[in-house]
A protein has these predicted regions:
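Structural signature of FAD isoalloxazine-binding scaffolds in flavoprotein oxidoreductases
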Residues: 146-149
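A charged helix-plus-loop insertion that forms the helical arch/lid used to bind
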Residues: 68-80
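Short beta-strand segments
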Residues: 7, 56-60, 98, 122-128, ...
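Adenylate-forming
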Residues: 104-110, 130-133, 152-153
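Glycine/small-residue-rich loop that forms an oxyanion/phosphate-binding "nest" at active or ligand-binding sites
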Residues: 72, 96-110, 122-123
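Conserved A3 ("GATE") glycine/threonine-rich loop of ANL adenylate-forming enzymes
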Residues: 11-12, 103, 127-130
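ATP-binding/phosphotransfer module of carbohydrate and carboxylate kinases, centering on a glycine-rich
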Residues: 1-54, 63-68, 85-93, 107-117, ...
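Short hydrophobic alpha-helix segments
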Residues: 28-30, 73, 143
Length: 286
């Protein structure tokens, strides 16, 4: 059976239709609308993709099991938006709504870099940090559907203020926006290029940034004990040349490294399609 999935991003909505073999056979993109127009745009995209008996949607933020957006920092005004219930009523099909990083993790686990594993964590390093967790072959959602908000894992008590209103969140130290702050406004590409040329300031920034990435990955490993950690998001292209440094610092930060098999650190393979593909794959769970 074909499936349709839509990934809602901060600037665009990306929809795909998958055939029975899981290949993308149709795509459509729309600018992300204001929160009060989101349901209408998602319904239009679903129709343009040909429709089917179910729809999967990935949305940034805190999503309830019923498909209600409780809060989404990257979508102004998106508080208590009833996406799932409204789409079910409007389209007359089954609708499954999940956090966007969770559906990307599901895609990488089912058909991407973590395929074949039973225990995996995906970390998306972008403007912020998102994630998804698979344990025992099951996607983990938690009691309220909020599992995987790893960017708001506290790594420094009373540290830098986060957009969530708290302090010391991991994404304030290991995200794309954190790298820009650390470097004094440089892009990730420019920072790593300068470090490769031997510029001392850039090398210091990269050392601190990779250390914060490693600290967070080690904490996730100590909690989840995964076989593989998939790293995706916009920052991954910048750090790919220093993954050996990240891996070494990650190993140093692990609890009881001599008694455990270290999880593999791999980069995501599905690119910007991961969220939409994961949404389509997860639609069958509706």
């Amino acid at each position: 059976m074909t499936s349709v999935g839509i990934d809602v991003g901060g600037t665009k909505c990306h929809g795909v239709r998958l055939d029975d073999a899981g290949a993308v056979v149709a795509e459509v993109r729309y600018p992300t609308p204001p929160a009060d127009q989101l349901v209408e745009v998602l319904a239009r995209m679903f129709s343009e993709l040909g429709g089917t008996t179910s729809l999967g949607v990935g949305v940034p933020g805190l999503i309830t099991p019923e498909g209600v957006i409780r809060a989404s920092p990257n979508m102004p005004g998106a508080f208590n938006v009833s996406v799932g219930p409204a789409l079910r009523e409007l389209l007359g099909v089954k609708v499954h709504v999940e956090n966007d990083a969770t559906v990307a993790a599901y895609a990488e686990w089912k058909v991407g870099a973590a395929h074949g594993s039973q225990n995996a964590v995906m970390v998306t390093l972008g403007t912020g940090i998102g994630g998804g967790i698979v344990m025992g072959g099951e996607l983990q959602r938690g009691a309220n559907g909020f599992a995987g908000e790893i960017g708001h894992m506290m790594v420094e008590r009373n540290g830098l203020e986060c957009v969530c209103g708290r302090r010391g969140c991991w994404e304030r130290y290991a995200s794309g926006s954190a790298l820009r702050t650390l470097s004094g406004g440089m892009s990730g590409e420019d920072v790593f290029a300068a470090a490769a040329r031997g510029e001392a300031h850039a090398q210091s920034v990269v050392a601190e940034f990779t250390d914060w990435i490693a600290v967070g990955l080690a904490s996730l490993t100590n909690i989840c004990d995964p076989e593989v950690i998939v790293i995706g998001g916009g920052v991954v292209q910048s750090i790919v040349d220093v993954m050996d440094v990240v891996s070494a610092r990650f190993a140093e930060a692990l609890y009881s490294p001599e008694w455990r098999q270290h999880p593999r650190l791999v980069t995501a393979t599905l690119g910007e399609r991961a969220g939409a593909i994961g949404s389509a794959l997860i639609s069958s769970l509706a």
